[in-house]
Structures are given as C-alpha cells and as structure tokens.
Amino acid sequence: MAEYYALQRQLLQVTLICTVVIFGAVWWAYSLNTAASYLLGAMGGLLYLRMLGKAVERIGERRRQFGKSRLALFVVLIVLAARWQYLELMPVFLGFLTYKAALIWYTLRAVIPTAENS
C-alpha cells in the first residue's frame, strides 16, 4: 500500500504543478477572469483525482457505490460555469481536465525506459 500512496501523492503533486504553471500562462496570455475560471476547474479536477484515489483504495470492499459524488462534482462545476456570468465554461472544463496531464506523465514515465527504470 505504501507504493500506492506514493503514486497517489506524486499524481497530486504533478497535477498541482501543472495547475500553477498553466494558471500563470493563462493569466499572462488572456486575463485574470479566464485564469480564475481555469483555476476553479483545475481545483475541481484536483478534488476529483483525490476522490478517485479514495475510491480505488476501497476496491474490494463489499459496498457497491458508483461514482455519483465524482460525477456530481463535475456537473456542479459545469453548471456553475454556465450560470455564473463571471466564469467562462471552456477554461473551467479544460481546468478540470488538468489532472489528466498527471496521468499521462505517469504513463509515459512507466512506458519509456530511463536510467532509473532500467
């Protein structure tokens, strides 16, 4: 389990680093409003990744509960972005998907041989 927790921590850290870098780039290239929309989505994605990790941790238990709360998080973010005039929908959505960058990073790190992995 220690290896799983280390992986979970790494994924959260990489997601957070990507969030900070992309937030700065969006703020520089667009506006603070767009960057704030991105940041809201990215924080939602970070929370989603954490919830997903907790769900994976519970695999094998007898409880059969589907990811309703994770889906609800995504729906609330999108509805909030669509209804609130200060938020932009696309940056919120793309911000939410930022956690995928950490998953891609991990996959590439696992597949591409390096001096550490050899």
From Swiss-Prot:
Q: Indicate whether ATP-binding appears among the record's keywords.
A: no
Localization: Cell membrane
Q: Which Gene Ontology terms describe the biological processes this protein takes part in?
A: proton transmembrane transport
Q: Which InterPro entries match?
A: CGL160/ATPI_dom (IPR056309)
CC terms in the record's Gene Ontology section: plasma membrane; proton-transporting ATP synthase complex
Q: Which domain of life is it from?
A: Bacteria
Give the membrane topology.
Multi-pass membrane protein
Similarity comment text for this entry: Belongs to the bacterial AtpI family.
Q: Which PANTHER family match?
A: NF-KAPPA-B INHIBITOR-LIKE PROTEIN-RELATED, PROTEIN CONSERVED ONLY IN THE GREEN LINEAGE 160, CHLOROPLASTIC
Name of the protein in its database record: ATP synthase protein I
Q: Which organism is it from?
A: Synechococcus sp. (strain ATCC 27144 / PCC 6301 / SAUG 1402/1) (Anacystis nidulans)
